A protein has these predicted regions:
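Nucleotidyltransferase catalytic core that binds NTPs
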Residues: 1-190
Length: 190
C-alpha cells in the first residue's frame, strides 16, 4: 500500500520552508510521496493579497523543481471541498489503496482548534507535525495536545506512523528553516 503525506496550504507563495519539511517527512516517516495540496481559498485567510490559484500552483511547481516524490495538486478544487476535514475522507474514497498522513507545521498545530471540525482530521488519518519557527514552549500547550496526548508517538518511533491507526500522531523536531509566506509577501528575507 502506498503512503502519501498531505501538505495542505495556500502556498502564497510556496517557498523553501515547504520543501524543507516535505523532504524531512519523506525521510523520517518513510513516505512514498508528498502531495502539496494548494488550497483554492483557505477559509481562515483573507482573499485580499491572495495570488490566483494558477499563480500559486506555478510557484509551488517551481519550488518543487520536478522532485520525483513531491507532487503539486489542486485536488481540492476538483473534489469541491473547502475544509481539510472534508477533503481527507474524499481522498480516502477516491484512493482506497492509499494511506494518507496529514503533514503540518507547529505553527498550524497551535491554531488548529480554529479549523472546521479539526478533531475529525486527527480521527481520520495519522498526523505528523514538523517544527516550524517560532519554536519554544508553545507546543507544550495546545488543544490538539490536550485532546490527543495519549496517542502521541515519540519521534524515535515516527516511522511507525504510516502503519498506525488514527488517532495517532507525532511531532518531528527537525532543523528549522525560517522562511515564511507572510515574510516573503511583506518583503522580508530570512
Amino acid at each position: 500500500m502506498t503512503t502519501i503525506g498531505l501538505l495542505g496550504g495556500s502556498f502564497n507563495p510556496a517557498h523553501e520552508g515547504h520543501l524543507h519539511i516535505s523532504l524531512y517527512a519523506l525521510k523520517m516517516l518513510g513516505l512514498d510521496a508528498v502531495w502539496w495540496m494548494v488550497s483554492p481559498q483557505n477559509p481562515l485567510k483573507p482573499t485580499r493579497g491572495m495570488a490566483t490559484l494558477t499563480e500559486r500552483m506555478a510557484g509551488a511547481e517551481k519550488i518543487v523543481n520536478r522532485h520525483p516524490r513531491i507532487h503539486v495538486t489542486d485536488i481540492e478544487k476538483h473534489l469541491g471541498t473547502r475544509y481539510t476535514a472534508d477533503t481527507i475522507p474524499a481522498l480516502k474514497i477516491r484512493f482506497p489503496r492509499t494511506r494518507f498522513i496529514w503533514l503540518m507545521g507547529t505553527d498550524n498545530l497551535l491554531q488548529i482548534h480554529r479549523w472546521q471540525e479539526w478533531e475529525k482530521i486527527f480521527l481520520s488519518v495519522p498526523v505528523a507535525v514538523l517544527d516550524r519557527p517560532p519554536r519554544g514552549n508553545t507546543v507544550k500547550s495546545c488543544r490538539a495536545l490536550e485532546r490527543f496526548r495519549s496517542r502521541l508517538l515519540p519521534q524515535d518511533e515516527a516511522a511507525r506512523l504510516k502503519h498506525a491507526h488514527a488517532p495517532a500522531w507525532t511531532i518531528l523536531h527537525i532543523p528549522l528553516n525560517g522562511q515564511s509566506s507572510t515574510a516573503i509577501r511583506n518583503g522580508a528575507t530570512s
